[in-house]
């Protein structure tokens, strides 16, 4: 009898015992950051800064133009390079994509080639303000149907009963297969793969993992039941209830709007526990901004990086880029003026190049964590939008984010004192 039990244990897949994603086989987690390679853009004449010094150009590899894309994506460490590598792999048989926007020519070409080879493709995109009746059709996605009409399905979601934007950022390779690949990011499938400042997270894991099955659930629920918030919640929860694997402890996933409250609770818990918080976001308001106000009142050290659109929206008292002056004034009043250690990435507002990262790093007395994902740190991201958020404690991933944050804060970002006095774009 004992021999029989031992034999059964040996035959049982190691994955049935996994409680961490890193326990599953295979496991690979590769965080990549766009870190664009850009020309030096000089001012016509040197510009005076707030502290009275002068600068001759915008910060190199921070301020970029579309002409810089080719060099940026040619590197094998570029997120776009890795996306195309995944799409083009001979073992890729089916792809799920969910994004707010989709326009990358290089990725579109790779997807077309894949479809021509027989790869099935399902895409979910935001459909604009009247998605159900008159969706705004995406030219790049619709064009892919010409590569294989019966293999490409495009679904438009968002801005219907109880819902905001379809703002997920997910690519899934071979959903439901023995081995699956999941990509989640701050960036859209646009210049977010190249010259925006973004994070892209590439994971290879077992199809048996909760993580893999949950991502399959969310995209299929968006396609099949994403017409209203209630229908989506019912479908997603029903699908997840059938997953036999436990949710992993080293990477927890939250899908808004269903899991928004749980995600906020996790961030609040981590913020209160942390001895240092380092964060960056494109938009920042609502419950998370209120949490940071409290943490500042509690004398919690916080470092924060914003797009310089926020800085200029306050200085010029007008909306700049994709940020609003109302939001910017509130960030200054409630956070920056109360001691939040803030710097800015000087991006190119003329071409809507963005600091589009949204992540927080929590340093605890022992270990640390990263909170990241698709959504901005706003009320809508946790209550209305389709979003995917993650709380990660895998040491190697936390270390990678710490290293990148140091690069941003110490080398690439500009303090308020060093910002140009006048609004000049070379």
Language model segments and positions:
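Sec-dependent N-terminal signal peptides
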Residues: 4-13
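HKD-type phospholipase D/PLD-like phosphodiesterase module
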Residues: 19-93, 101-270, 307-395
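Sec/Tat signal peptide C-region and signal peptidase I cleavage site
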Residues: 14-18
